[in-house]
Amino acid sequence: MMISGLRSSFSFFTLVPSRQKDIGNPITFLPLVVTVGALIGDSILYITWQFSHLIASFLSISSIIIYNGLNHFDATADLGDALMVRDKSRIPEVIKDHHVGAGGIFAVIFVYGIAVLSLARSTLYIGLVGILIGQVVSGSSMMISLIGSQPFVPGLADYFISLFRKHSVGYTIEFLAIPIIVSFIFSPLYVVIVALNLLIVQLTKTMISRRFGGINGDVIGFLGEFSRSLFIFMLIIIAHYNVASTYDIFSKMLSSFTS
């Protein structure tokens, strides 16, 4: 059962292939999936940081996008195009359209540009922490967005909402507790950033849901990407103004490796 759940999570949320025809329940092990993505992004950031902060940041975020199979990247572009549509009845048609318009291009540049530029302006330590917690918050944001939601078209959102409702209390606790615990390990202040991040993302979901008449897979994917970028941006601002101390045990360990 556990192996099947792991396969479902990795095959659905990443480019890792699987022979399973039924996607099963990919929700439970999503925190593990996003953590692996964070380790990939952090590894690339750490290795390439000495050459160019901007290139290192770009490669790190790109590696996570590729690890996700470009699914959420595509979702971000689709949502950007859909938000440009004035006629509500045309939204499902625009989201399914494979062509990318001005709205989609802007959404991609905005969401990923925030993450890349923020990382490039940070220290290596803050960048590594930002990617790790940002990934965890990203996964939680996607799942928490299912609470009280309705799909505006039949599809993956409908399936995920039904899965979530079967264990709504357990999943809600899981996806709220994990980012809080992970962020608290580094700094209690990061818990505040996580809480504010989740609140902003859920408010964003509410506005999109009212505009579209519900959510779909693209909305869920976009919220995850937006959440990661938003967390990294917020963390870098806090660190820039020295509100959060980076002189903890993890910072000292990293300094010993890089010195």
Swiss-Prot record:
A molecular function GO annotation: adenosylcobinamide-GDP ribazoletransferase activity
GO cellular component terms listed in the entry, alphabetical order: plasma membrane
Organism this protein belongs to: Thermoplasma volcanium (strain ATCC 51530 / DSM 4299 / JCM 9571 / NBRC 15438 / GSS1)
Coiled-coil annotated residue ranges, if any: none
GO biological process entries: cobalamin biosynthetic process
EC number: 2.7.8.26
Domain of life: Archaea
Signal peptide: none
Catalysed reactions listed for this entry: alpha-ribazole + adenosylcob(III)inamide-GDP = adenosylcob(III)alamin + GMP + H(+); alpha-ribazole 5'-phosphate + adenosylcob(III)inamide-GDP = adenosylcob(III)alamin 5'-phosphate + GMP + H(+)
The keyword RNA-binding appears for this protein: no
Pathway: Cofactor biosynthesis; adenosylcobalamin biosynthesis; adenosylcobalamin from cob(II)yrinate a,c-diamide: step 7/7
Chief localisation class: membrane
Enzyme's top EC category: transferase
Membrane-spanning segments: 27-47, 51-71, 100-120, 124-144, 175-195, 219-239
Keyword tags: Cell membrane, Cobalamin biosynthesis, Magnesium, Membrane, Transferase, Transmembrane, Transmembrane helix
Family, as annotated: Belongs to the CobS family.
Cofactor: Mg(2+)
Membrane topology: Multi-pass membrane protein
Record-given protein name: Adenosylcobinamide-GDP ribazoletransferase
Disulfide bonds: none
Role according to the record: Joins adenosylcobinamide-GDP and alpha-ribazole to generate adenosylcobalamin (Ado-cobalamin). Also synthesizes adenosylcobalamin 5'-phosphate from adenosylcobinamide-GDP and alpha-ribazole 5'-phosphate.
A Pfam cross-reference name: CobS
Species lineage: Archaea, Methanobacteriati, Thermoplasmatota, Thermoplasmata, Thermoplasmatales
Compartment list: Cell membrane
